[in-house]
């Protein structure tokens, strides 16, 4: 893991993250113009960072937040589509992989159901190699239709990459899912605003440490007339230490080199802090000393997760018993979310 140079090598993946200014757009013409602006920025960045293998743009950077529902549906894109064609051409020209936001992607039942909040990973040949739909939209504000799974794809120089989006990153389960699928770099694209800056910076660092993985965060910056976005895009080592972090500046960039061999060596040879190994080999020192084998205990000790898998409805009821049983809150209503208990059919 190295920071401060503009290069990369056969063993290091040069990763850049961007504090893209949150755009305020209203139609597809504006979206496509902004997509071309992102493409031009990517190509320019390659001149300044010749070692750049991967560039990451934030959530909402392509379309902005459509606060008008009609505009949200009217600007929802297809994948592949006009937006991705612009990004693919830029990846080919810059000979660089890119991660881009599509908010939203048309639902299969468009326009009868809300769009998805989607990220795409495009390789340096212009091919889409991963499409991830946000599993945990930022309720109660975001009205995206939720996705249902994470992915791992082989990225530049063989580094294994997973994508997550913004509020996803507040749930340790999604990081663990990516790591246990083999992700070595988890990319968190976000359009996060104040007041939650300190919490979000802390969360990404903690999850890098807890999952023995690299983390790249690209966040929006600026003010779009509604929210103030705090930037602080960052690249974090698999030991939880920040390699490089922007401030709040619009279009700020950070860059670091992520060693492929270093993370694989750490996962194979680290012991006391090898969290993903130890989770499935619980107490192996004591188990071995007892003569009960040399693999520790693999069984899941967490009753809630067992319940969630075997009876999701009962798990939901348990959560409601310690929180609330309606999605809306009577003292602070958001939209038309119900604040009185309804019967599910």
UniProtKB/Swiss-Prot annotation:
| Enzyme Commission number(s) | 3.5.1.4
Q: Which CDD domains match?
A: aliphatic_amidase
Question: CN hydrolase domain spans which residues?
Answer: 13-260
Question: Mind telling me which InterPro entries this protein's record contains?
Answer: Aliph_Amidase/BUP, Aliphatic_amidase, C-N_Hydrolase, C-N_Hydrolase_sf
Q: Which reaction does it catalyse?
A: a monocarboxylic acid amide + H2O = a monocarboxylate + NH4(+)
Enzyme class, top EC level, equals hydrolase
**Tree of life domain:** Bacteria
What are the catalytic residues?
59 (proton acceptor), 134 (proton donor), 166 (nucleophile)
Question: Which NCBIfam families does this entry report, sorted A to Z?
Answer: PRK13286.1
User: What is the protein's known function?
Assistant: Catalyzes the hydrolysis of short-chain aliphatic amides to their corresponding organic acids with release of ammonia. Also exhibits in vitro acyl transferase activity, transferring the acyl moiety of short-chain amides to hydroxylamine to form hydroxamates.
Q: Into which family does the record put it?
A: Belongs to the carbon-nitrogen hydrolase superfamily. Aliphatic amidase family.
**Name listed for the protein in its UniProt record:** Aliphatic amidase
- What is the species of this protein? Rhodococcus erythropolis (strain PR4 / NBRC 100887)
């Amino acid at each position: 893991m190295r920071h401060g140079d503009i290069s990369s090598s056969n063993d290091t993946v040069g990763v850049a993250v961007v504090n893209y200014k949150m755009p305020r757009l209203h139609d597809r013409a504006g979206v496509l113009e902004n997509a071309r602006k992102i493409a031009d920025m990517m190509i320019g960045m390659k001149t300044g960072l010749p070692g750049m293998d991967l560039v990451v743009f934030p959530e909402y950077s392509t379309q902005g937040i459509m606060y008008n529902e009609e505009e949200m549906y009217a600007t929802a894109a297809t994948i592949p589509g006009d937006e991705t064609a612009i990004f693919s051409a830029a990846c080919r020209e810059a000979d660089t992989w890119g991660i881009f936001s599509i908010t939203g992607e048309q639902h299969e039942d468009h326009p009868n159901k809300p769009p998805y909040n989607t990220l795409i990973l495009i390789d340096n040949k212009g091919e889409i190699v991963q499409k991830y739909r946000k599993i945990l939209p930022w309720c109660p504000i975001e009205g995206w239709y939720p996705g249902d799974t994470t992915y791992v794809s082989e990225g530049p120089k063989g580094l294994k990459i997973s994508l997550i989006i913004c509020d996803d990153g507040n749930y340790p389960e999604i990081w663990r899912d990516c790591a246990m699928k083999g992700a070595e770099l988890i990319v968190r694209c976000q359009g996060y605003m104040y007041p939650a800056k300190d919490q979000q910076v802390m969360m990404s660092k903690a999850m890098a440490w807890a999952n023995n993985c690299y983390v790249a965060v690209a966040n929006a910056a600026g003010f779009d007339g509604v929210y103030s976005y705090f930037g602080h895009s960052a690249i974090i080592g698999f030991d939880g230490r920040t390699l490089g972090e922007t401030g709040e500046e619009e279009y700020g960039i950070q860059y670091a080199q992520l060693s492929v061999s270093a993370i694989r060596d750490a996962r194979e040879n680290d012991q006391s802090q090898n969290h993903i190994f130890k989770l499935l080999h619980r107490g192996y020192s004591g188990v071995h000393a007892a003569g009960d084998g040399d693999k520790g205990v693999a069984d899941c000790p967490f009753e809630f997760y067992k319940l969630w898998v075997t009876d999701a409805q009962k798990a939901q009821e348990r959560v409601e018993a310690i929180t609330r049983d309606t999605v809306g809150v009577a003292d602070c209503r958001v939209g038309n979310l119900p604040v009185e208990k309804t019967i599910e059919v």
